[in-house]
């Protein structure tokens, strides 16, 4: 049984369709990331799951029980769902301990014991318990918000872009710590984000949302390497898209012959490669004949660790752009050999 099931969820504001027949299953203990651009409907979907809003159509099922089905509506505070908002939303007039323990019942000793357990769980030094929210770092504030959400022992944790306000290094470490914590506690979770890297690294199930619909749902590696369509492919990372002729498990394209992930397709198709699949080797003239594909570097856009290279394929004159790790041995006018690792992905007809 799934922890959460969404069936044909629909939502409109006046005449604008925000969510269009959303179906999603969240397995027990799993981490799901809903990723999409601003305005795609992902936060509205999260609020419907939490019970802050009601859908116009569909069903919300939590651990086999209807939270909403058109006749049944269970309010947010009775769903047993934890919620961590984007800014943490800590109570400024409560200490760290007061925030974590907000809503806990029982004796003062029981509350203190539970607060200490939660601080240990989210790797917060107990000496911070008497401090005010403004006296601790952004990463610590997010851990306090997570501990507060965990205090009620939720069956599902919802995370609404909780790392977006943190700097890059802190965001990565906090994200990893939260993912490990939720896995250890065997709590199913849903992260909403517009950051593709965050979604791919946090989740074991990624749902790409576009214009109120789920375009593709599946394991992160599947979505990255075999996306359902070109918009999903480009949204999840840098791509090289090529038109090719297919036959006998190969694509004949500007890069020569490339292996593909569907040996049965024939005819013209669009194929996709990720930049890390392409290896560039600087060549001397006497090495040209040994290369499967030759290209000339016509422009380099340096951006630190990554550079964007504009290459002209010598055999066809076609120009392509690829991103690669910046290297001192690459310069304008250089002839390079291109080698492809792995298979190109063929988009569905």
UniProtKB/Swiss-Prot annotation:
| Domain called ABC transporter: residue spans | 4-236
- Positions binding ATP in this chain are 36-43
> Where the protein is mainly located, per its record?
membrane
The record's subcellular location field reads:
Cell inner membrane
Q: What does it catalyze?
A: Fe(3+)(out) + ATP + H2O = Fe(3+)(in) + ADP + phosphate + H(+)
**PROSITE patterns according to UniProt:** ABC_TRANSPORTER_1 (PS00211), ABC_TRANSPORTER_2 (PS50893), FBPC (PS51242)
Give the Enzyme Commission number. 7.2.2.7
Give the highest taxon in the source lineage: Bacteria
* Membrane topology qualifier: Peripheral membrane protein
- Give any GO molecular function from the UniProt entry: ATP hydrolysis activity
Outline the subunit composition: The complex is composed of two ATP-binding proteins (FbpC), two transmembrane proteins (FbpB) and a solute-binding protein (FbpA).
- PANTHER family listed in its UniProt record: SPERMIDINE/PUTRESCINE IMPORT ATP-BINDING PROTEIN POTA, SPERMIDINE_PUTRESCINE IMPORT ATP-BINDING PROTEIN POTA
Q: What is this protein called?
A: Fe(3+) ions import ATP-binding protein FbpC
Gene name for this UniProt entry: fbpC
């Amino acid at each position: 049984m799934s922890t959460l099931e969404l069936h044909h969820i629909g939502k409109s504001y006046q005449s604008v369709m925000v969510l269009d027949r959303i179906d999603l299953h969240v397995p027990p203990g799993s981490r799901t990331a809903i990723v999409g651009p601003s305005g795609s409907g992902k936060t509205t979907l999260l609020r419907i799951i939490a019970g802050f809003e009601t859908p116009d159509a569909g069903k919300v099922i939590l651990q086999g029980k209807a939270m909403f089905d058109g006749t049944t509506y269970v309010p947010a505070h009775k769903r047993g769902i934890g919620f961590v908002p984007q800014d943490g939303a800590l109570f400024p007039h409560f200490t760290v301990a007061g925030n974590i323990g907000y809503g806990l019942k029982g004796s003062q000793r029981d509350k203190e014991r539970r607060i200490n357990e939660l601080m240990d769980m989210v790797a917060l030094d107990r000496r911070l318990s008497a401090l005010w929210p403004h006296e601790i770092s952004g990463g610590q504030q997010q851990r306090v918000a997570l501990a507060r959400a965990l205090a009620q022992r939720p069956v599902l944790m919802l995370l609404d872009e909780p790392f977006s306000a943190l700097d890059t290094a802190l965001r990565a470490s906090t994200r990893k710590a939260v993912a490990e914590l939720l896995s250890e506690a065997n709590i199913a979770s849903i992260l909403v984000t517009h950051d593709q890297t965050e979604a791919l690294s946090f989740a074991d199930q990624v749902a790409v949302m576009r214009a109120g619909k789920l375009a593709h749902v599946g394991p992160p590696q599947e979505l990255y390497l075999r996306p359902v369509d070109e918009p999903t492919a480009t949204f999840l990372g840098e791509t090289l898209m090529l038109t090719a002729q297919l036959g006998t498990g190969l694509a004949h394209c500007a890069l020569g012959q490339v292996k593909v992930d569907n040996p049965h397709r024939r005819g013209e198709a669009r194929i996709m490669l990720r930049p890390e699949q392409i290896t560039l080797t600087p060549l001397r003239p006497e090495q040209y004949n040994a290369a499967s594909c030759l290209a000339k570097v016509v422009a380099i856009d340096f951006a630190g660790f990554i550079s964007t290279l504009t290459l002209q394929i010598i055999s066809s004159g076609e120009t392509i752009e690829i991103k690669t790790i910046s290297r001192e041995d690459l310069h304008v006018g250089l002839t390079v050999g291109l080698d492809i690792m792995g298979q190109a992905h063929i988009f569905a007809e």
